[in-house]
Amino acid sequence: MKKVRITAIRKTCYPDLMEKYENPIQHACEVEEGQVWVANGWCKPEGFCDSAWDSISPFVMTLAHGGGDFYDGWMKNPKSAMISCNDGFRPVSFYLEALDEDAE
């Protein structure tokens, strides 16, 4: 099993949707663009958002176990994926890439 690098590539915010539909929340997404985590195989990195992990974990698991080439050639690098979290008000796009380093 391999380690997988997770990089926050883009964070978007839709204030109009938040104003119209969302109840105010105390601790909204604190992810910053450029932030990097490394998943030790299938394990969620410490401090990584639980909700975002629910969205990306199937792809992390596949990459960690040597899989890839999602959706028949979707990504230029077959050992990678670009996956967004499921927050419709402030989605974050994460670039996932399998590393050559073995998980511990």
Residue ranges of model-derived segments:
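Short, compact, well-ordered microdomains
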Residues: 58-104
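Short, Lys/Arg- and Gly-enriched loop/turn segments at beta-strand edges
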Residues: 44-55
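Short, surface-exposed beta-strand/loop "edge" segments at domain boundaries and coil↔beta transitions
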Residues: 13-19, 46, 102-104
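Intrinsic-disorder/low-complexity, polar/charged segments enriched in Ser/Thr/Lys/Arg/Asp/Glu/Gln
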Residues: 3, 36-38, 91-93
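Short, flexible N-terminal segments of the mature chain
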Residues: 20-44
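Catalytic cores and adjacent flexible loops of soluble metabolic enzymes
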Residues: 17, 51-52, 59
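Short, structured beta-strand/loop micro-motifs enriched in basic residues and often containing a Trp
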Residues: 2, 8-22
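A short, structured loop/turn motif at beta-sheet edges
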Residues: 1-3, 30-33, 101-103
